[in-house]
């Protein structure tokens, strides 16, 4: 299975600084074991897995986070990194809010003056 995988430094405006997170853009919803194995291989504090809900990006994305050893309920920097990936790859227009459906509820990210909130 081919998967788009990005490494994003959150809370940084200079490469190789900030808090890194891996972000996987998924076409299908793989099983939990596969996501855990990817997170172990990335060996970052968190790896985010995004899959689009419905037929349009505006319908939101399912978002899950895994550490190298377990799934976690919430991760701020990997959420911001996920929004960055959606906007920079053109999956979602920059002026649109990114909506993430997570185990912790609905999370939303927007941009303001070049920063992700």
Where are these predicted regions, by residue range?
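N-terminal lobe of the biotin/lipoate ligase/transferase fold
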Residues: 1-71
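Acidic, low-complexity central loop/insert segments
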Residues: 37, 59-62, 66-117
